[in-house]
Amino acid sequence: MTEERRSRATEAFFGRRKGKPLRNQQVDTIENLLPLLKIDLESVPPQNLVALFPADVRSIRLEIGFGGGEHLAHRAVENPETGFIGVEPFVNSMAKLLATVRERELMNIRLYDDDATQLLDWLPEGSIDHIDLLYPDPWPKKKHWKRRFVSDVNLARFHRVLKPGGKFCFASDIDTYVNWTLQHCARHGGFEWTATSADDWRTPYANWPGTRYENKAKREGRSSAYLTFIRR
């Protein structure tokens, strides 16, 4: 398991939050750009999260553990009328996304660089249209499964912040985590799995850009599952 994936855990984040030394330009984005984009949990959250964005956005999408930010940036460019909130505690990954935000002048992204559960508890009820949890740390050893981000308590958080009819998308190349997520969502009762055939969960999401973890899984001979749930 990589240190980056280890940093993206469940109720708290385990492992180090910084890897290789940052280059000067990356340090600049962390010190000067991140404070402009970071959500301040000490402030009172707006009832309508579109107020967080200078861009004219109409819906809100949350990605937890965005890694290098390839998917988040792709979706932000693809959907300029959607406001994106990205959560990633790993400093090097945050620096990569910030470089893209600066280069592409993306105005529809806001960020949080700590425990995602803190942000989820801050968000107003029914304020999010879509949540992405893509290739989260699988914690493959059974004794560590309780550390997985998908849990009863975190699904309750998702259900609280998602609007009725909102989407929760989960992708993983680890079969036990896919089954774990299906079982937890079924037990919760507030999430409807949309699949009607195997092709529905074997086929990547529309306009899917791929991720580094997906590519690694393919090289190692593992296929991925792409689950979509609707918040009841």
UniProtKB/Swiss-Prot annotation:
Q: What is this protein called?
A: tRNA (guanine-N(7)-)-methyltransferase
Question: What positions does the entry give for substrate binding?
Answer: K141, D173, T211, R212, Y213, E214
* Function according to Swiss-Prot or TrEMBL: Catalyzes the formation of N(7)-methylguanine at position 46 (m7G46) in tRNA.
PANTHER family in alphabetical order: 3-DEOXY-D-MANNO-OCTULOSONIC-ACID TRANSFERASE/TRNA GUANINE-N 7 - -METHYLTRANSFERASE, PENTACOTRIPEPTIDE-REPEAT REGION OF PRORP DOMAIN-CONTAINING PROTEIN
Please indicate if the UniProt record lists Transferase as a keyword: yes
- Record-listed E.C. numbers: 2.1.1.33
Top-level enzyme category: transferase
**Highest taxon in the source lineage:** Bacteria
Q: Detail which positions bind S-adenosyl-L-methionine.
A: E63, E88, D115, D137
A GO molecular-function annotation:
tRNA (guanine(46)-N7)-methyltransferase activity
Catalytic residue list: D137
One Pfam family hit: Methyltransf_4
Q: Which organism is it from?
A: Agrobacterium fabrum (strain C58 / ATCC 33970)
Task: Look up the record and report any one GO term of the cellular component aspect.
Answer: tRNA methyltransferase complex
- Database matches in InterPro entries: SAM-dependent_MTases_sf, tRNA_(Gua-N-7)_MeTrfase_Trmb, tRNA_methyltr_TrmB_bact
UniProt keyword terms in alphabetical order: Methyltransferase, S-adenosyl-L-methionine, Transferase, tRNA processing
Decide whether keyword S-adenosyl-L-methionine is in the record: yes
Gene name, please? trmB
Family, as annotated: Belongs to the class I-like SAM-binding methyltransferase superfamily. TrmB family.
Reactions the enzyme catalyzes = guanosine(46) in tRNA + S-adenosyl-L-methionine = N(7)-methylguanosine(46) in tRNA + S-adenosyl-L-homocysteine
Q: So which residues are the signal peptide here?
A: none
